């Protein structure tokens, strides 16, 4: 079982991270940097509202809470689109901070009474939710125009020459896809249940595609040749006027959290849509991996005939193994984490950039919704809002405590404000 002290520590780390992202004046927190994102003050109060809902109101939105019902509903993400939230009568930042602090104090009292045999899933859900919103707030801050509010990030390890453009073989055969509550008690519903699948051999990129490799695609006219693009992708490329990854400037620089800088050739490319990733792969004579292929390359140990908890083994993520936590503000150069390689030799599979896969979001066989029933189910393929592609592996902005090889993210194929990149795959 997960110790109460561990849950308390993870709650504290998430809150510390959140508060660092809202250390700005009230006017700044109420700004909407882009219609795709919420004002930061909405995210802040929403974090507290969801914590209260799941830990103090038993997940029942009709159960009275600390906020008046009409205020509580302002923070329902399904009721109010991101574009509309700037026009809502939101709590002032001081009230939002006070609300979050009060909820947290009561939540910790509840944690103290948690039975010893309770794995604390509701607390883990709240921790994951807050950390995911911290990444969302970083996306918003990256879209902000004007003088920088954040620094350029902590130093990162150097990369290794010769790894870009290389691949590793993943032999075919059965493996265990997904996890169960016994092995990963804090896994989310779409990661479960564990089940055996058998897939053919394939090759997968040792590291993600780099900025330098993407520059070759641009220089070769990749954005101007419809033969590399799917019909939907080409239509979007034309409609949106895509000519390079988001935040790349015509003079060869990029804008990152308001800082103008040269584009490092050895960093994984980020801020590309699924359609761009798909086109690049076609141009490179490759394809995108399926999410099942991706998970096997990341987590399966063919010698042990079992899953690894992380690509490198059982050790918890650290600065020597992966770029996580958000303090770097960017991906690490490829080859920076040889100790973090998977059993097959694939590197940087956790952290740095979310990697587009070719897979739509589907439930695993035997899927059962968790207590937060709307977490996954409304987004599955075939639902009214089910136009999504799965991304795997996390990014530099993801908290290390919530990331697993089985973690499944998803977004619309046109989105690229997210910290998204590409890893290639090939048939064998």
From Swiss-Prot:
Fe cation binds at residues 46, 129, 133. It catalyses: gamma-L-glutamyl-L-cysteine + hercynine + O2 = gamma-L-glutamyl-hercynylcysteine S-oxide + H2O. Its cofactor is Fe(2+). Gamma-L-glutamyl-L-cysteine binds at residues 82-85, 411, 415. It comes from the Bacteria. Its EC number is 1.14.99.50. Pfam families: DinB_2, FGE-sulfatase. The keyword Nucleus does not apply. The keyword Oxidoreductase applies. GO terms for biological process: ergothioneine biosynthesis from histidine via gamma-glutamyl-hercynylcysteine sulfoxide. Pathway: Amino-acid biosynthesis; ergothioneine biosynthesis. One of its GO terms (molecular function) is gamma-glutamyl hercynylcysteine sulfoxide synthase activity. Keywords: Iron, Metal-binding, Monooxygenase, Oxidoreductase. It is an enzyme of class 1 (oxidoreductase). Monomer. HAMAP family: EgtB. Belongs to the EgtB family. Catalyzes the oxidative sulfurization of hercynine (N-alpha,N-alpha,N-alpha-trimethyl-L-histidine) into hercynyl-gamma-L-glutamyl-L-cysteine sulfoxide, a step in the biosynthesis pathway of ergothioneine. Cannot use the alternative thiols cysteine, N-acetylcysteine, or glutathione instead of gamma-glutamylcysteine as substrates, and histidine is a poor sulfur acceptor substrate compared to hercynine. This is Hercynine oxygenase. The gene is egtB.
């Amino acid at each position: 079982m997960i110790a109460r002290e561990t849950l308390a520590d993870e709650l504290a780390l998430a809150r510390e991270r959140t508060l660092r992202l809202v250390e700005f004046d009230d006017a700044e927190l109420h700004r909407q940097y882009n219609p795709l994102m919420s004002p930061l003050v909405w995210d802040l109060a929403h974090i507290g509202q969801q914590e209260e809902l799941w830990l103090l109101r038993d997940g029942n939105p009709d159960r009275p809470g600390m906020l008046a019902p009409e205020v509580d509903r302002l923070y329902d993400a399904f009721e109010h689109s991101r574009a509309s939230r700037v026009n809502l009568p939101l709590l002032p930042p001081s009230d939002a901070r006070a609300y979050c602090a009060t909820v947290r104090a009561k939540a910790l009292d509840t944690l103290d009474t948690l039975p010893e045999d309770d794995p604390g899933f509701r607390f883990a859900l709240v921790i994951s939710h807050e950390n995911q919103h911290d990444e969302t707030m970083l996306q918003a801050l990256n879209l902000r125009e004007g003088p920088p509010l954040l620094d350029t990030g902590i130093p990162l390890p150097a990369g290794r020459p010769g790894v870009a453009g290389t691949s590793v073989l993943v032999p075919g055969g059965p493996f265990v896809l997904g996890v169960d509550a016994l092995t990963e008690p804090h896994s989310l519903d779409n990661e479960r249940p564990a089940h055996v699948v058998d897939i053919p051999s394939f090759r997968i990129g040792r590291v993600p595609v780099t900025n330098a490799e993407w520059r070759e695609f641009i220089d070769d006219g990749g954005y101007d040749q419809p033969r590399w693009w799917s019909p939907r992708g080409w239509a979007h490329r034309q409609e949106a006027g895509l000519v390079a990854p988001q935040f790349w400037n015509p003079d060869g620089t990029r804008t990152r959290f308001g800082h103008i800088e040269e584009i490092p050739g050895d960093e994984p490319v980020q801020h590309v849509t699924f359609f761009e990733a798909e086109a690049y792969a076609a141009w490179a004579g490759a394809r995108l991996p399926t999410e099942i292929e991706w998970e096997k390359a990341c987590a399966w140990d063919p010698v042990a005939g079992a899953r690894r908890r992380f690509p490198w083994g059982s050790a918890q993520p650290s600065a020597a193994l992966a770029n996580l936590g958000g303090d770097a503000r960017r991906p690490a150069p490829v080859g920076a984490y040889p100790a973090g390689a998977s059993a097959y030799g694939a590197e940087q599979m956790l952290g740095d950039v979310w990697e587009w896969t070719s897979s739509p979001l589907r439930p695993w066989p035997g899927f059962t919704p968790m207590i937060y029933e709307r977490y996954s189910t409304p987004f599955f393929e075939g639902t009214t809002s089910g136009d999504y592609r799965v991304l795997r592996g996390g990014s530099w902005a993801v908290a290390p405590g919530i990331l697993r090889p089985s973690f499944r993210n998803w977004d619309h194929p046109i989105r690229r404000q997210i910290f998204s990149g590409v890893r290639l795959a090939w048939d064998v």
